Regions:
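Non-catalytic cap/lid and distal C-terminal segments of serine-dependent acyl enzymes
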Residues: 1-226
């Protein structure tokens, strides 16, 4: 959340300093970064899987309008049509359970978000931890959701990451290997010019917040560069 990741308004944190330097050095375009939680109470808790699945609806109906109606963005309006027209200027990413939410966002919010950054977590749409147990079915589910909205591989870019010592490595890698069998939709490349998806694995990377910062640092320039 904003308090745990950015240390609140006016505060400082490693991630905040990192992003500021990236913008200052020209590694990425200036932007607005919002760090919400999917929990429905300040104390957290609840059914993670159900809360994750419900988040995309809250994102479109509540979160984005609350932010973009108060700030200068590419959205001329914050209704669904306005958000759809400005989808090229919006990205979503998350670590661990946030990565599972990122895959739900890809399924439900492709109309409103073009770029995705799942970090150390597979897609749970078919079943919890389904990226590993049901990799093929998971990829076919993702493809079906894209095609139903009328999009092609040219309409999105996914930069997925994890580490070799991360507990999410096997599940995420199984899902990526299944995706490679469908290059008509998931064309693997190093950037937007060469593909619709990139999978970056950090040797020795573990399931900790410090490695999450490393992933963010390497992904953001691939979405918007000067």
């Amino acid at each position: 959340t904003v308090n745990s990741i950015f240390n609140g308004p006016g505060g400082t944190s490693n991630l905040k300093r990192m992003v500021d330097h990236m913008i200052q050095n020209g590694d990425m375009e200036p932007g607005i970064i919002v760090t919400p939680t999917y929990y429905n109470s300040a104390s957290g808790g609840g059914n993670d899987a159900e809360l994750a699945k419900a988040f995309p609806e809250e994102f479109v109906n509540d979160l984005v309008p609350a932010v973009e109606s108060q700030l200068h963005t590419y959205a001329e309006t914050t209704d669904r049509e306005g958000l759809k027209q400005s989808r090229d200027h919006r990205a979503f990413g998350g670590f661990s359970m946030g990565s599972a939410i990122t895959w739900y966002m890809f399924i439900d919010c492709l109309d409103y978000v073009k770029y995705y950054m799942p970090m150390s977590g597979d897609c749970w749409a078919v079943q919890q931890s389904g990226g590993e147990a049901y990799a093929e079915q998971t990829i076919l589910y993702l493809i079906d959701s894209i095609e139903k909205k009328g999009y092609t591989r040219d309409d999105f870019f996914i930069y997925a990451m994890t580490g070799t010592l991360d507990m999410a490595y096997q599940g995420m890698t199984a899902q990526m290997e299944a995706a490679k069998r469908y290059p008509d939709m998931f064309l693997f490349g190093k950037d937007q010019q060469t593909g619709s998806i990139c999978y970056n694995v950090l040797r020795g990377g573990q399931h900790t917040l410090g490695f999450c910062y490393w992933y963010v640092y390497h992904a953001l320039p691939y979405f918007w560069t000067k």
